[in-house]
Amino acid sequence: MGTGFARGARGTAASGPGGGFLFAWILVSFTCHLASTQGAPEDVDVLQRLGLSWTKAGGGRSPTPPGVIPFPSGFIFTQRAKLQAPTANVLPTTLGRELALVLSLCSHRVNHAFLFAIRSRKHKLQLGLQFLPGRTIIHLGPRQSVAFDLDVHDGRWHHLALELRGRTVTMVTACGQHRVPVPLPSRRDSMLDPQGSFLLGKVNPRAVQFEGALCQFSIHPVAQVAHNYCAHLRERCRQVDTYSPQVGTLFPWDSGPAFALHPEPALLGLGNLTRTPATLGARPVSRALAVTLAPAMPTKPLRTVHPDVSEHSSSQTPLSPAKQSARKTPSPSSSASLANSTRVYRPAAAQPRQITTTSPTKRSPTKPSVSPLSVTPMKSPHATQKTGVPSFTKPVPPTQKPAPFTSYLAPSKASSPTVRPVQKTFMTPRPPVPSPQPLRPTTGLSKKFTNPTVAKSKSKTTSWASKPVLARSSVPKTLQQTVLSQSPVSYLGSQTLAPALPPLGVGNPRTMPPTRDSALTPAGSKKFTGRETSKKTRQKSSPRKPEPLSPGKSARDASPRDLTTKPSRPSTPALVLAPAYLLSSSPQPTSSSFPFFHLLGPTPFPMLMGPPGSKGDCGLPGPPGLPGLPGSPGARGPRGPPGPYGNPGPPGPPGAKGQKGDPGLSPGQAHDGAKGNMGLPGLSGNPGPLGRKGHKGHPGAAGHPGEQGQPGPEGSPGAKGYPGRQGFPGPVGDPGPKGSRGYIGLPGLFGLPGSDGERGLPGVPGKRGEMGRPGFPGDFGERGPPGLDGNPGEIGLPGPPGVLGLIGDTGALGPVGYPGPKGMKGLMGGVGEPGLKGDKGEQGVPGVSGDPGFQGDKGSHGLPGLPGGRGKPGPLGKAGDKGSLGFPGPPGPEGFPGDIGPPGDNGPEGMKGKPGARGLPGPPGQLGPEGDEGPMGPPGVPGLEGQPGRKGFPGRPGLDGSKGEPGDPGRPGPVGEQGLMGFIGLVGEPGIVGEKGDRGVMGPPGAPGPKGSMGHPGTPGGIGNPGEPGPWGPPGSRGLPGMRGAKGHRGPRGPDGPAGEQGSKGLKGRVGPRGRPGQPGQQGAAGERGHSGAKGFLGIPGPSGPPGAKGLPGEPGSQGPQGPVGPPGEMGPKGPPGAVGEPGLPGDSGMKGDLGPLGPPGEQGLIGQRGEPGLEGDHGPVGPDGLKGDRGDPGPDGEHGEKGQEGLKGEDGSPGPPGITGVPGREGKPGKQGEKGQRGAKGAKGHQGYLGEMGIPGEPGPPGTPGPKGSRGTLGPTGAPGRMGAQGEPGLAGYNGHKGITGPLGPPGPKGEKGDQGEDGKTEGPPGPPGDRGPVGDRGDRGEPGDPGYPGQEGVQGLRGEPGQQGQPGHPGPRGRPGPKGSKGEEGPKGKPGKAGPSGRRGTQGLQGLPGPRGVVGRQGPEGTAGSDGIPGRDGRPGYQGDQGNDGDPGPVGPAGRRGNPGVAGLPGAQGPPGFKGESGLPGQLGPPGKRGTEGGTGLPGNQGEPGSKGQPGDSGEMGFPGVAGLFGPKGPPGDIGFKGIQGPRGPPGLMGKEGIIGPPGMLGPSGLPGPKGDRGSRGDLGLQGPRGPPGPRGRPGPPGPPWHPIQFQQDDLGAAFQTWMDAQGAVRSEGYSYPDQLALDQGGEIFKTLHYLSNLIQSIKTPLGTKENPARVCRDLMDCEQRMADGTYWVDPNLGCSSDTIEVSCNFTQGGQTCLKPITASKAEFAVSRVQMNFLHLLSSEGTQHITIHCLNMTVWQEGPGRSSARQAVRFRAWNGQVFEAGGQFRPEVSMDGCKVHDGRWHQTLFTFRTQDPQQLPIVSVDNLPPVSSGKQYRLEVGPACFL
């Protein structure tokens, strides 16, 4: 670039002053034309396409969109920004698949926002860039993305490029030095939907907005641009991170008329480096501003040849390289800042021509870049430079030496010219206005001026000695169309205008070859040194000797005088193309004789250029030019001393939550301090820039309140602070902006199950209806065409939570486990082997929001949500006028203590505030030291009624006194001191029904009870699960031939056969003759056990055969396989007493026994330790008045004092030592049970007591009365099967069942026996319709009533349930008789009770006495009679404490005193009688299964209870003994065809073949298992065949039937039915039945009707609908049958039994057909699924998943890690099969989030995920080892559904 200008200068010398400039401007115009016509039209400036042009950013007329704040380096996007446009308006349709994205941005807020997103017309993401904390993700499609480890949320500017080429995405940083390529797994979609939408700053209109500054966002169709993207960065973008931006530069400002009229240095850019460049780039249209052309400075003085002013050549002596680096420091007179920078204007619309400038800058790690419209993509070896926004530059390390200028045009280090349009404005020269003081060196140049660039040296050589610091410039467009006349600029032109001209001979600036001009570096030229200037030049240039700095001398070594106070040395003053008001309107300046610019109109041939001419001679130096404008701002100087503290900035956004602080040390209970006065509101500080951290300065005085500053970047998490006090609630804030769409939440809590309805009364059995007329089977209807697509529905509410993601890839091979026990033979596995559990993957990229799901069912109310996070601060509003001082606002919430600031001045003392509200009671303080004993005060007023104290210690025996008269009742005395622990009292009377208490914990298993009497036979149990096959037994002896078996069960539904082709209709064959009976065959050898055959169709029951002859006793057969576990057998006979078992676990307290005889006095016990005082209980109810006691001895009269004021309650003194335990007194009569007190605090753990010896078993007590009905207990664990009991008595007849709905017509029954002779008809009846009845006979017997239930066996004794909740208080029982009087000792006379005396002072603490010797056991006295109650006596005066007297008669219950102080914990009392029935409590948590108790005896038969509701299916019992063969039952109807079951044991015989010859009687088979109770039998068998009656009268002909249509049946499905019908027809004919033709036709129609029904049934079995009537086995069956099923609720029946036990599940088809079971309630791990159904579901599944979330408050529920013994404190999860998931165990859950370890007074949650390949582990049935709950520590359980696949 400099080369071109040098040639222009030579042209000036050769052809005159004007010809050179004409030639130069022709080059400029031609270059601009090439740049405009041969540029890169496909480069896309996204900001400009979105309407954010630079003219707008610089203060143009068009307003910026809301939420976008322009500033000199680009645009700031706030939360309110919404930029969206059609994709076709932003990106050209010709954009290929190879792209390069060049970005320059700075993030202000950490979030997950997208910088941009391109979505298709269907709202699918096609391309997007997302910034996560620590990562940068580029999305190439809905499910294709690439992540890079680049964090842009660090508050710094980032320049980067992304290359999208083929199957590779490359991120390029550091100007191409750092590249990270990432291959794509699949080919990305290259076509972008032009009808889609382009969003800037977010991924969708509801998403979170990118908040930050964006300088450049360009898209290039050439992917290689990314590797040299710095060459395509705009100048202002390369400078943004070089300077510290100030707040003032971030907002547009107007360069008003003051700037135009007063060209002061401060206004021209020298005083404020941040405002001037913004002005220069802000309004090129209205101001016609040009940009300073700073001088190029060679590093040595060059000799110049000038006829007039050669002696002044030393004034142009440039600086040495060291001084050039020194010019980077700020100086008032330095102009190097703009000399090293170039103003870059935003391209205006439709600018046809451009000016090319270059910018050589200093070397730094970040390489510079140029505008996207660059002409020559060359690298620059220099650092990023300031372009006009910032005020300071980054210091360049002094070790980076500048390269020689000869490398400037080298291919690898050449600078890149920037093409930018300027305003097409004509400028007229005007005389310059003299500039004030800092620019005096510039004014001197108007007289003496030489050209230092092209000079003749004595050696006839011209050279650039070192790397010059060229200036970048921007020339107004006016200069493109003008020819510069001869002016002083022509002598500067070779230096200052060199950057504006391209090299000669360059056709396309984009492909400019690296040329080297001889004017710059001629071959063999001598390099000038820094001392080759003439002495004459030096002497006349300045009185001072030049002091160039050495190359090794840095800017910091240069003195300030060298940098700031040498007017003749810094550089050649910059002659500027000034604004229009500085240029003259005539060719000659009006204030001097020097020519200036002569601006002509457009040249006639601007685009014509001849071949490059030969190199011209150096021209003569021109006259000195006009004084230049003020120089450009100087470079940044050395770091100054640290300034004073700035005013505090505005409060920043809330930082990340700090860790929990250490608990504070509490020296004791702190008294509440007085409420301080409300302080005056503080002044707001000036918004300070985000500067580098300076040295700690002295505290400055408080500044004036400043305007609200820009929100600073989000700070890093602060140091761990102390928790602040709870502040007053602040005023209600304005509603914040609408937040981004949140992630799909967890499923809500499941609702509680509804209460069971009342059992209805059994209905009256209905009358049997008349036989309906059978209809003819209809044709199969063809499947209807699919319906039209419905109109799209409205957007529904947010659907249920999304399903889990796809199953991940197979994980790495895990460690080889220990060999497990040999398992039973498993079922046929599913497709494919499940892979091993993979390692936990990294957190995936947040997926794109899915389509709206189906509307889910309304969930129950969930737990209260956690408080939401604080919203983002809104955009900064315009600063308003300073308002008047407002009233003090309410105090805001107190924040965390900040850093200790400098002490401020003491403010004026404020007014005393009003007393604050009484604070919450503080924590109890530590007990202070005991104070000195104060003087005795005056006797106080009698205190309030005290609470009755505990029983005192017995006193010494007193003398016998005379019995006094009854005294007056005295007032209640003061509250006595807390007594010591009393003795165990007798069992009290039943109290009144208490309030509903909390559910108690599960008690220990009780001791085995006495064997009860035999109970009534129970209801028949359910069908048990098949047991594991047992070992083969020895061959048994051959049994006798068995009797005919009972009716079999309904067979399971067989598999569907393949559909056969429709056969042709065959001719009806004649009935063949009956064959002769064959010879009986020989008995074959017993074959081997065959494999299990496929399950065949259920055959229609054949006719009953005649009973066979009694067979011979058979040989013992081989032991067969162990059959399935049968129902529990009946109770066996009582066995002999077993051996004495081991001592059992301690049982619950037994019932109250009878009063035993008085035992001998026990030994004196040791004094127990005093327990911790319990919490203060509530006041009990006032009891009835007690008996008046005997008058006590009169106490000493106290002095009557005046009534004193009520004193304050003194502090509790320390408890005194317990005194010597006295003789146990007689127990008083227990009072009524008080109200339930509040729950006390958890007491300290007591010492482990010694295991007592087992007592003698007591006599069984009398049978108690039936207790009240207890609350429903939780489902206990399955007990072990009981022994086979003896056969019970026949059960009672059951209720008559309700009449069921009319079932479908069953298949034809078996052939009935011939009926009795019918009676002759008397009258001829009307012709009946064709019926479906059997052979004509008498009416059969009335059907038998329902079979009585099988006698059930006595169930296994269940575990003791958890204690029920405390019942309501019962009514007081009748007063008991006085107990027998105990042995009476020496009774002292009782004194009269005296009046209450004054409370004495508390005595000093006495020494603890030694335990007394053991007393002599006294004789037992005779039992006295109970005395009658005495009359109440009067209260006497208080007497002295008497010695221990004998126990008096039990008095009546006295009035309940006031609530006393909590006493020490007493010993546990005896168990009281059972209370009344309490309210049903909430179901408690499932307790651990207790140990199995010993077998109890048979209890007495109880009264027949009410029929209970249907219970859960019981566990399978052991196989019972074969029962006695029952009577022949009625034949039942054939059952429905069931689904294909799992492969079972050897199947039953197949379909019944044709009737064969009766063979010999076979061996007696093994007795089958007793079957379950069958359905009510159909019509009974016909009776014995009666005598044949005469034929009846012929009936009338029936109505004509419908036309015959051949029915199309599937051969395989209906073959068995046809065969059966044919067999039946053959049997009818063979036995000689003569049916009329009409009857045969009716039978055929009935059979076809049955077949039609069976066909429909088979079709429904093939395609289940998932309804309650037609359930599927699992959800996967529904997905296999119907490929397009919606997720939702369906019904399944895993065991394919009766439809009454179907399960309602949630099917997740998007996850492969998961079957999800919901818990009964989300707060408990309970599932309303029977164990039988669950076992089948486990067999049908191969894996399971379940989530459990624990919401906790200040509670840790999971701790796991090496070396932590605290893992024992973590929660444990019990699986369905009994295994335990726990920390550190064999099975551990996945903890994806553990927020409960944070204890900050807020709710957190810990999420546990259970994924297992063993489905029998799920669902989780209990959560154990949860920490105890207190007022400050709570938890909530949220159990998710268990999903099986």
Swiss-Prot record:
Residues 429-439, 639-654, 1588-1605 have a biased composition (Pro residues). It holds the Pfam family Collagen. Residues 1-39 form the signal peptide. Residues 1645-1845 form the Fibrillar collagen NC1 domain. Disulfide bonds join 1675-1707, 1716-1843, 1752-1796. It is found in: Secreted, Extracellular space, Extracellular matrix. The keyword Nucleotide-binding does not apply. Residues 327-343, 356-372, 677-690, 699-719, 896-909, 1074-1086, 1112-1122, 1152-1167, 1360-1369, 1395-1422, 1438-1465, 1557-1572 have a biased composition (Low complexity). Transmembrane segments: none annotated. Belongs to the fibrillar collagen family. This is Collagen alpha-1(XXVII) chain. It comes from Mus musculus.
